[in-house]
Amino acid sequence: MTSIIKLTTLSGVQEESALCYLLQVDEFRFLLDCGWDEHFSMDIIDSLRKHVHQIDAVLLSHPDPLHLGALPYAVGKLGLNCAIYATIPVYKMGQMFMYDLYQSRHNTEDFTLFTLDDVDAAFDKIQQLKFSQIVNLKGKGHGLSITPLPAGHMIGGTIWKIVKDGEEEIVYAVDFNHKREIHLNGCSLEMLSRPSLLITDSFNATYVQPRRKQRDEQLLTNVLETLRGDGNVLIAVDTAGRVLELAQLLDQIWRTKDAGLGVYSLALLNNVSYNVVEFSKSQVEWMSDKLMRCFEDKRNNPFQFRHLSLCHGLSDLARVPSPKVVLASQPDLECGFSRDLFIQWCQDPKNSIILTYRTTPGTLARFLIDNPSEKITEIELRKRVKLEGKELEEYLEKEKLKKEAAKKLEQSKEADIDSSDESDIEEDIDQPSAHKTKHDLMMKGEGSRKGSFFKQAKKSYPMFPAPEERIKWDEYGEIIKPEDFLVPELQATEEEKSKLESGLTNGDEPMDQDLSDVPTKCISTTESIEIKARVTYIDYEGRSDGDSIKKIINQMKPRQLIIVHGPPEASQDLAECCRAFGGKDIKVYMPKLHETVDATSETHIYQVRLKDSLVSSLQFCKAKDAELAWIDGVLDMRVSKVDTGVILEEGELKDDGEDSEMQVEAPSDSSVIAQQKAMKSLFGDDEKETGEESEIIPTLEPLPPHEVPGHQSVFMNEPRLSDFKQVLLREGIQAEFVGGVLVCNNQVAVRRTETGRIGLEGCLCQDFYRIRDLLYEQYAIV
């Protein structure tokens, strides 16, 4: 049976913002990606909030924030609680993306939208899959299966194939790349022929991409000229996606002696650079065949870089000799080390800035790409500095009050410690810094308590109310206090002290440093900066070009196409091209923001609610794996809010023109108006008020018995004559084919007519009626 398929666009249509879409297949709802843009627009969150409790599963296609950036917020703040599916690299690298993004923001501003704990909680819900692994969903998703296929854009990047009962095939393919690269193979399209629905993006639909060789030569020339001119090169990259391709390319160039770059430095700078490289080493099986062969034949891990230095902060980078090439995150230049280096290096004409990614319009990197002639720009300078003077005194006073309150609470707990024996066991361990280490071994005299596994019924305490530290025991002996074994912290070096004085601690230290020990605040100023360095955009996005996208869609030949994520001009161009290729065989949709697209294959399918009295009166006939029944009922337009419905095919639903609840002008047109109202309520705008989480579905009520009209029998599940022959033989009836006609006991002939219907011929005898009954049993008759 054909399924009801709808797509609601929450973000990422007719524009280049983050991707987030709600796909409904019958009663099951998928969230396709959960991205957030570089500016953390709350419009995306507001759209997601309306549907968050309807979502049954989340499918993540890529590990970058544009595809999963809003996931920690949705789980931590909106209460998203459902299965989340992603490949293993998307799970691991997605964490690296979000860790680096959080730390990059936290280093220069008071970032409170989500925390690292929210990131961990969100990624703990992810079910990790391998490519081509078929997952059959359960519960509301019974009959649905999902399969991740390689997209070729980033490591673990996925094209999702969703199949309903082996019939409806939905393909979600955004940001794919068919070309083979150094570290990734191209996308796999062999398993994606003739899908029922293709959801794809138009980001590159009108983009003419230079050849890879030309781009590599441009990059090498730019780097050589800058380094030989005693300048530094900043390459703005992402955290753990496309940076792997550039790191492989540059490390290979550095290994080539003819290039003459061995005397210069190459560095990777982000908050999680070490973890990114280590994860890459363990995921070689997800990469290109070339890297796999290199690893298997030479036993040499391709991510064991010879020339690439890993840096976690500006202090690490300062130890790398200049001139140097630095791969720094973030690609949008809105935050992170790339922004810090851009501000430092852009005013020196010797330096070069290379942008590798077209980020969302409105970001600094996109401004530089779209306006290459602009040499003066206003930039907000953000940094975190330590508190001084009155602010520091106020902060210390607040901390002192907090500590005093905590100390009083602790003393009150210790005063009540002798209320019961059990409270002595269950009391929490004191704060690490609350007590001073006294000795290594337990002294028997202390606390007047013996060291044994058995508690004494009677305790003795000092006569005077002097608080005394009590030694706590459990089944294994004395409870260990971690503070007794701590090594005293070393004095800060002069270098670290100077960094604290200059207020650069947050930006210069690795991510794992506890910044809460130093009282700080964030300040920002806006300055006009003259860009004297050379700024170049070289495409290393890893996406298919416009012509290739159109050829791929034409090769797949989808019956329906929904175009998302791209500027309006590119979406229109791709739609016109696909209509020209497919003609009437393809339906193309270009939804607007918050619009719901009805992509149901059969248009005469309605979703209604059945009354219990009607369901109990139905007589079902089994046909293969389904049960069918004929329904005569009245469509009640007084709608009821429900979450699910029953799907009825055209011909099985009868509207009563005399329904008193329907306000119509003429009774003869009542059924037409009822259908129009039903279609409006069923396939209209799903965007209701915030509190209306469920769809509004009309109710089908039973007709009075005296008004039920008769109908001709409908024969379904038509058998094949070869199968019917086996049935006759099992019943002891001789049957054989003679000229395509099944002859039974030499008295009855069963043949298929030119119209495809089965006819029964012969004399009216006992065998004729017996064979007719056996033939009827092969059908589902309603």
From Swiss-Prot:
The modification Phosphoserine is found at residues 419-420, 423, 660. Pfam families: Beta-Casp, CPSF100_C, Lactamase_B_6, RMMBL. Keywords: mRNA processing, Nucleus, Phosphoprotein, RNA-binding. Its main location: nucleus. The lineage of its organism: Eukaryota, Metazoa, Chordata, Craniata, Vertebrata. Component of the cleavage and polyadenylation specificity factor (CPSF) complex that play a key role in pre-mRNA 3'-end formation, recognizing the AAUAAA signal sequence and interacting with poly(A) polymerase and other factors to bring about cleavage and poly(A) addition. Involved in the histone 3' end pre-mRNA processing. Changing residue 543 to A: Inhibits histone 3'-end processing. It is found in: Nucleus. Residues 407-416, 439-449 have a biased composition (Basic and acidic residues). Belongs to the metallo-beta-lactamase superfamily. RNA-metabolizing metallo-beta-lactamase-like family. CPSF2/YSH1 subfamily. GO terms for molecular function: RNA binding. Component of the cleavage and polyadenylation specificity factor (CPSF) complex, composed of CPSF1, CPSF2, CPSF3, CPSF4 and FIP1L1. Interacts with CPSF3, CSTF2 and SYMPK. Interacts with ZC3H3. Residues 407-449 are annotated as: Disordered. InterPro entries: Beta_Casp (IPR022712), CPSF2 (IPR027075), Cpsf2_C (IPR025069), CPSF2_MBL (IPR035639), Metallo-B-lactamas (IPR001279), RibonucZ/Hydroxyglut_hydro (IPR036866), RMMBL (IPR011108). One of its GO terms (biological process) is mRNA 3'-end processing by stem-loop binding and cleavage. This is Cleavage and polyadenylation specificity factor subunit 2. Residues 417-430 have a biased composition (Acidic residues). Changing residue 289 to A: Does not inhibit histone 3'-end processing.
